[in-house]
A protein has these predicted regions:
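Membrane-proximal intracellular helices of multi-pass ion channels
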Residues: 1-453
Length: 453
C-alpha cells in the first residue's frame, strides 16, 4: 500500500506544472494564515475580528499587498501581528525564490541549445545555481531587513521615546513589511505621523525600492560590480524603466498635490519634496503612505493607477504587470511607429514570442482590473475613480487605499481577495504557462492582413 501511495503521489506531482505548484503553495499559506488569525489568541483585547477580516488579512499578507479591512495595530494582538509578519516574510521570500526557481524548472523543459542561448543572452539562473539562488536571496533579505530595522529601532527609541522592546518590534515589523513591499503598518495612520521625519521615511522607501527592483537584478549588479557592459537585457530594461518612472511619480505628486491642503499643501518645501519622493516609490509596489491618500486629487489617483498597474521588477516582491513587460510593449510600439521590421533594444532583438507574451499579460491584466471595477462601481455607492484605485491596488498588490476597503460589501471584499491572489501569482504562472505551452506545427496557414486602425 505505501508503494502504491508513493507512486500515486509521484504521478500527481508529475502532472502538475511549476505554476500549479506555486498556486497550491500560496493557497495553503493563505488557509493556514486565516486559521491562525481566526484563533481567539490572535485578537486584541476587546476585539473580535470576523472570519472575513482574517481571510482578507491573511491573503493581503501572503500576497504582500497591504490592503486591510481592520486596523492591524488595534484589531490583532501581539500574536496576531506576529502571524501577519510571518505571512509577509513567507509570502515575500517565497515569491522571490519560487519565481526564480520557476526559471530553473522551466529550463528543464527546453533543449540544451536553447538553455545555453538564454543563459548567454540574459545571464539567467541555471540548474546548477539553485543553491546560489537560495543563498543569494537569503543574504539580500537579511542584509536589507536587518539594516533597515536597526535604523528604525534606534530612531523610535531616541526620538519617539519608545521602550526598547516596542521599538525593536516596530523596527523589525516595518522593515520586513518594507522590503517585502507589503505596506502593513502598526500605526492607525500608517506612516502619516512620520511624514516630516527623513530618518523613518528614507530607510523604508529605500528598502521598498530595493525589494521592488527584483532579485535577479540585485544579484547581477553584485556579480558585475556595477559594470553596465556586463548587464543583461533584463537588468538594463528594469533599471531604465525605474529611472524613468521614479521621476514621473515624483512629478505627479509635485504637480498634483503641491498646493493641496489635504496632502502636501501644509508642509514646508523640504517636507513636500520628501513626501513626493516617498510617494513616487510607494505606488510602484508598496502600500505605505505618509499623506492621506483619500485627500489626493482625482488626477493624482489616475496617475497612481498607472504606476501601480505597471509595478516593479520581475522575480522580486513587486506587483503589477512588471517593468520588463511594459518596456517590451513600449519598444514594440516605437519600432512599429518607426517602421522597423524588428524590435531592437540595446542591440538585442526581442523575439515575437516575447512580444506576444507581454501583450497577453498586459491585456489580461487590464481585463482583470476593468471587469471587477465595473461590477463594484455598479453595486456600491462609491465613485468610479475610488473603486478603480482600490481594484488596481489589489491587482497590483500595492496596498494603497482611498479608505473604502473596510466599507465595501463582503462579496466586494471577496473580489479584492481574488484580485490580490491573481495579481500576485498571475504574471508568474501565466508567463510560465505561455513558455511551456508553445506548440510547434509541421505546417503554417497562409498569411493574411486585416485592416488595423
Amino acid at each position: 500500500m505505501p508503494v502504491v501511495s508513493v507512486r500515486l503521489r509521484a504521478r500527481l506531482s508529475a502532472h502538475r506544472g511549476p505554476g500549479q505548484l506555486v498556486v497550491l503553495g500560496f493557497a495553503a499559506a493563505v488557509v493556514v494564515g486565516t486559521v491562525l488569525l481566526s484563533l481567539p489568541v490572535s485578537a486584541a483585547p476587546g476585539q473580535t475580528p470576523s472570519f472575513m477580516a482574517a481571510l482578507f488579512t491573511a491573503t493581503s499578507a501572503v500576497c504582500v499587498t497591504g490592503l486591510v479591512v481592520v486596523d492591524t495595530s488595534t484589531a490583532w494582538s501581539g500574536f496576531g501581528q506576529g502571524v501577519v509578519l510571518a505571512l509577509i516574510q513567507v509570502g515575500g521570500f517565497g515569491i522571490m525564490t519560487l519565481a526564480s526557481l520557476l526559471g530553473v524548472l522551466l529550463s528543464r523543459r527546453l533543449g540544451l541549445r536553447t538553455r545555453l542561448t538564454a543563459a548567454a543572452s540574459t545571464r539567467s539562473v541555471g540548474l546548477g545555481d539553485v543553491r546560489q539562488v537560495l543563498v543569494g536571496v537569503g543574504a539580500i533579505t537579511a542584509v536589507v531587513e536587518i539594516t533597515t530595522a536597526t535604523v528604525l529601532t534606534a530612531r523610535f527609541m531616541t526620538v519617539y521615546d519608545e521602550p526598547f522592546g516596542r521599538a525593536l518590534w516596530h523596527g523589525a515589523f516595518h522593515s520586513v513589511s518594507a522590503f517585502n513591499n507589503a505596506g502593513f503598518a502598526l500605526y492607525p495612520d500608517n506612516l502619516v505621523r512620520f511624514a516630516s521625519d527623513p530618518w523613518v521615511c528614507v530607510p523604508l522607501t529605500l528598502a521598498v525600492l530595493v525589494g521592488g527592483i527584483g532579485f535577479p537584478v540585485l544579484l547581477e549588479l553584485r556579480r558585475s560590480r556595477w559594470r553596465p557592459r556586463r548587464w543583461s537585457l533584463h537588468t538594463r530594461l528594469t533599471l531604465l524603466l525605474t529611472a524613468v518612472l521614479l521621476p514621473a511619480g515624483f512629478l505627479l505628486m509635485v504637480l498634483g498635490e503641491w498646493s493641496n491642503p489635504a496632502t502636501l499643501g501644509s508642509m514646508d518645501t523640504g517636507g513636500k519634496l520628501l513626501n513626493a519622493f516617498v510617494h513616487a516609490v510607494m505606488p510602484r509596489t508598496a502600500g505605505f503612505n505618509t499623506v492621506d491618500v483619500a485627500g489626493m486629487n482625482p488626477g493624482t489617483w489616475l496617475g497612481t493607477d498607472v504606476l501601480m498597474f505597471i509595478g516593479g521588477g520581475s522575480a522580486g516582491t513587486a506587483g503589477g504587470i512588471k517593468l520588463t513587460t511594459f518596456a517590451v510593449l513600449l519598444f514594440a510600439i516605437w519600432s512599429e511607429l518607426r517602421g522597423d521590421p524588428d524590435v531592437t533594444v540595446f542591440d538585442r532583438r526581442i523575439s515575437t514570442t516575447t512580444q506576444r507574451q507581454a501583450l497577453a499579460v498586459a491585456l489580461l491584466g487590464v481585463a482583470a482590473v476593468v471587469a471587477p471595477a465595473i461590477v463594484i462601481t455598479s453595486t456600491s455607492g462609491f465613485s468610479g475613480d475610488q473603486v478603480l484605485f482600490e481594484v488596481v491596488s489589489a491587482f497590483a498588490t500595492v496596498g494603497l487605499s482611498t479608505g473604502i476597503t473596510a466599507d465595501l460589501q463582503v462579496w466586494h471584499q471577496l473580489l479584492l481577495v481574488a484580485l490580490m491572489f491573481l495579481g500576485r501569482l498571475g504574471p508568474i504562472t501565466l508567463g510560465t504557462a505561455l513558455a511551456l505551452r508553445e506548440r510547434r506545427r509541421l505546417f503554417r496557414y497562409p498569411e493574411s492582413a486585416p485592416v488595423i486602425g
